Amino acid sequence: MTNQPLTLAEKVWRDHIVAAGENGGPDLLYIDLHLVHEVTSPQAFDGLRQAGRKVRRPDLTIATEDHNVPTIGVKTGDLQEIQEPTSRLQVSTLRDNAKEFGIRLHSMGDIEQGIVHTVGPQLGLTQPGMTVVCGDSHTSTHGAFGSIAMGIGTSEVEHVLATQTLPLKPFKTMAIEVSGELQPDVTSKDLILAIIAKIGTGGGQGHIIEYRGEAIEKLSMEARMTMCNMSIEAGARAGMIAPDQVTFDYLEGRPHAPKGADWDAAVEYWKSLRTDDDAQFDTVVHIDGSALTPFVTWGTNPGQGLPLAEAIPQLEDFTNDNDRLAAERAMEYMDLQPGTPLRDIKIDTVFLGSCTNSRIEDLRAAADVLKGRTVADGTRMIVVPSSTRVKMQAEEEGLDQIFIDAGAEWRTAGCSMCLGMNPDQLAPGERSASTSNRNFEGRQGKGGRTHLVSPPVAAATAVTGHLAGPADL
């Protein structure tokens, strides 16, 4: 086994097998980090309670309040700041469960509070070679560090809480090779949207994707997190990028990163986490990164996307009957006509936020476009940092004032308008340009229409009132 060439995913998987599966059964994997939030955990804790079990490794479990929290009016973190009764109950329940089971919790008002997929990396909890799980599909974000990170269901959350293990069958492996160098106006969000448009929302089904190549190696850690975050939108179980000096520089000095001799030993191990030269992937996809331009979605799934310079496709462009029917339904829901230039689509609300694109680099990129400009009449812009730490850093850099001066709303940290589960929602028929990850029907509010975009495109769109890129200003 040790002499067989392995992919990155296979190496991490191998190092976490507690008990190998027999006769095609699942392997039992050890879980290094379990992230918890208020929405998918209540029933899991109830299951523990009913069975008389404790949390096996509370030291490897961390909880945050993110999905249901408001982004306006949060001052102390008191439960009464949550107006919606169900949301307030879920947050209250998480606080009670964390206290009862001895789990570290970052609540509203806590300096470390934020979206769980930002909090893990910024604290240095997410590290190369780990297995990371959370009851949230965008756990794949953490794969940017060279970890196997995946979303799990509530019953699996209970299993990990009780045993710190998870039974899983090995997944297929896919390499997405991105050659060349991205153009200055092209971001990792444009790249991942282009990839999903190419392979489809089911293209990665049953696979762990490893993003490789020159364009990937030149991405910052935050840009890599955006890539891995949206792996699930291509149908993949997880996404990974091999750790390198960019990874090590990001982690060094963070609160939970190894220190001293432990750091040196960790880096030596992390350097081994690369796909062997002769390792075989089940699927390989090639992308020319240098040929990409800003990319946006027009439909109701992340695979229905096009370069910003293009127009809504003609129905006859779809040779597959299912794709054509899906496109027809998407155009009807989105109230769009074939042949309409994407730049002609008027936008009511611009949302800069979510675990995909509201880290400090994203806020800087949008602020660079907005500086000295104003949000168009008839358009509103909401800016929601992904964590309290990100918010504080942005304010130290004066980014908040750039947004406020432009006429945008500067909010506190949370998942916000990414999903219709808190007060930040679209009205029926309202159209958004959003830096989030899903454009499903009703995702941002019943009847809301969502176009997925990068932070620079979001900012340019806010200024013009229609889909636009910085080059259009």
From Swiss-Prot:
Pathway: Amino-acid biosynthesis; L-leucine biosynthesis; L-leucine from 3-methyl-2-oxobutanoate: step 2/4. It is an enzyme of class 4 (lyase). Keywords: 4Fe-4S, Amino-acid biosynthesis, Branched-chain amino acid biosynthesis, Iron, Iron-sulfur, Leucine biosynthesis, Lyase, Metal-binding. [4Fe-4S] cluster binds at residues 355, 415, 418. One of its GO terms (molecular function) is 4 iron, 4 sulfur cluster binding. Gene3D superfamilies: Aconitase, domain 3. Pfam families: Aconitase. This is 3-isopropylmalate dehydratase large subunit.
